């Protein structure tokens, strides 16, 4: 099979493997890449290539993740696999690799284990919308009833965390057999079934350009005779000259009109997701807009101060705090382009949070920020990152 160049014609979907240590996540990742590259083209990756995951930084946090790409008949997938449990926690909370769906790997020989549960909970908290299950090591279980039992346990666990356990596709197989070239129902056939489940069960994600217009404010200038220009990178959607937009966050929401879009000193009639632009605002004063606010389509996003979040607190060796923090700890929360002070309320059963922990917290900010569930942020003290988080639920 000749190597084909990367065709952007197929829709692109981001997935990743989650599940307990040693249940076969990396073996499955290698098996999928190997089997699908033979079936649909692309490049196979060996197990040890995936396991030696390079370090990357996301929001000031070092994470090891391996990236693999593969294709099915209908789609192009980017797949992330993490070597260690801590890397999963960090990856999911920082959104370093935002997942449109996850492949939960569970060993049929062991059944659900503590990290199986923890990864499902994390997936729920950070907003991974779909989970497909691969019941691995089925070649080691002779008893069909036992397989059924494990499958039931996994479905119950998914339902417990508000995933549709009864409707979730569960594929039985053996990643090891598939990787070794076994063509049978446990090997290649299981991987092909998994690919089909990914194609049909995980919907094609909305592209950034199709969303409601949103641009975080990075800088504000006053240009004599022209008015106020706000610069930034459009996160999603399209803004057209003449459209009404809202300025949201920090201060009371203001309505204004876009009277011009500028990119590389050229005037455009519209700006779209991914563009670094200057947006000219009619009748808006320079001091009415500041970094940390967003420009957005009216009514599409609202400002909030009170929310729950799933956070990861950096360990001492990662440049984080050296000491635990307690209830009412007041760091800065860095949303998009600015810091806002807020106080942290810990869960009732938690007296303190140690460096290296992940925990669910409740936050009250001193100023409102345009937010929605799934928004990422960094936790900082005097400009250095001490943690990362994601908005789980907006309270007020």
Swiss-Prot record:
Domain of life: Bacteria
InterPro entries for the chain: EF-Tu_GTP-bd (IPR041709), EF-Tu_GTPase (IPR050055), EFTu-like_2 (IPR004161), EFTU_2 (IPR033720), G_TR_CS (IPR031157), P-loop_NTPase (IPR027417), Small_GTP-bd (IPR005225), T_Tr_GTP-bd_dom (IPR000795)
Segments for region (G5): 174-176
PROSITE patterns noted in UniProt: G_TR_1, G_TR_2
Subcellular location: Cytoplasm
Catalytic activity as recorded in UniProt: GTP + H2O = GDP + phosphate + H(+)
Family of this protein: Belongs to the TRAFAC class translation factor GTPase superfamily. Classic translation factor GTPase family. EF-Tu/EF-1A subfamily.
Role this protein plays: GTP hydrolase that promotes the GTP-dependent binding of aminoacyl-tRNA to the A-site of ribosomes during protein biosynthesis.
Name of the protein described by the UniProt record: Elongation factor Tu
Organism, as annotated: Polynucleobacter asymbioticus (strain DSM 18221 / CIP 109841 / QLW-P1DMWA-1)
Gene name of the record: tuf1
């Amino acid at each position: 099979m000749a190597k084909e160049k990367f065709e952007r014609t197929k829709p692109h979907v981001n997935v990743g493997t989650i599940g307990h240590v040693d249940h076969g996540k990396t073996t499955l990742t290698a098996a999928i890449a190997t089997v699908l590259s033979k079936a649909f083209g692309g490049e196979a990756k060996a197990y040890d290539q995936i396991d030696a995951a390079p370090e990357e930084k996301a929001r000031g946090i070092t994470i090891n993740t391996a990236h693999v790409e593969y294709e099915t008949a209908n789609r192009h997938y980017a797949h992330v696999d993490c070597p260690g449990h801590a890397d999963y926690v960090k990856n999911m909370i920082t959104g370093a690799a935002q997942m449109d769906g996850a492949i939960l790997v569970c060993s049929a020989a062991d059944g659900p284990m503590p990290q199986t549960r923890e990864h499902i909970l994390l997936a729920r908290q950070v907003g991974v919308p779909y989970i497909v299950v691969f019941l691995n090591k089925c070649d080691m279980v002779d008893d069909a009833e036992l397989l059924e039992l494990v499958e039931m346990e996994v479905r119950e666990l998914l339902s417990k965390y508000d995933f549709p356990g009864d409707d979730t596709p569960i594929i039985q197989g053996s990643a090891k057999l598939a990787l070794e070239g076994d063509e049978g129902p446990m090997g290649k056939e299981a991987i092909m079934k998994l690919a089909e489940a990914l194609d049909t069960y995980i919907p094609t994600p909305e592209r950034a350009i199709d969303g409601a217009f949103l641009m975080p404010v990075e800088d504000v200038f006053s240009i004599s005779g022209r008015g106020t220009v706000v610069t930034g990178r459009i996160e999603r959607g399209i803004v057209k000259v003449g459209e009404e937009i809202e300025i949201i966050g920090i201060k009371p929401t203001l309505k204004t009109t876009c009277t011009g879009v500028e990119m590389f000193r050229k005037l455009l009639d519209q700006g779209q997701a991914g563009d670094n632009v200057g947006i000219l605002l009619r009748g808006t004063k320079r001091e009415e807009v500041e970094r940390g606010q967003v420009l957005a389509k009216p009514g599409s996003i609202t400002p909030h101060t009170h929310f729950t979040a799933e956070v990861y607190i950096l360990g001492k060796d990662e440049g984080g705090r050296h000491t635990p923090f307690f209830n009412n700890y007041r760091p800065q929360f860095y949303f998009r382009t600015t810091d806002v002070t807020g106080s942290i309320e810990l869960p009732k059963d938690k007296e303190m949070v140690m460096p290296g922990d992940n925990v669910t917290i409740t936050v009250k900010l001193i100023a409102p920020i345009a937010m929605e569930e799934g928004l990422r942020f960094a936790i900082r003290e005097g400009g250095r990152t001490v943690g990362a988080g994601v908005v789980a639920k907006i309270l007020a």
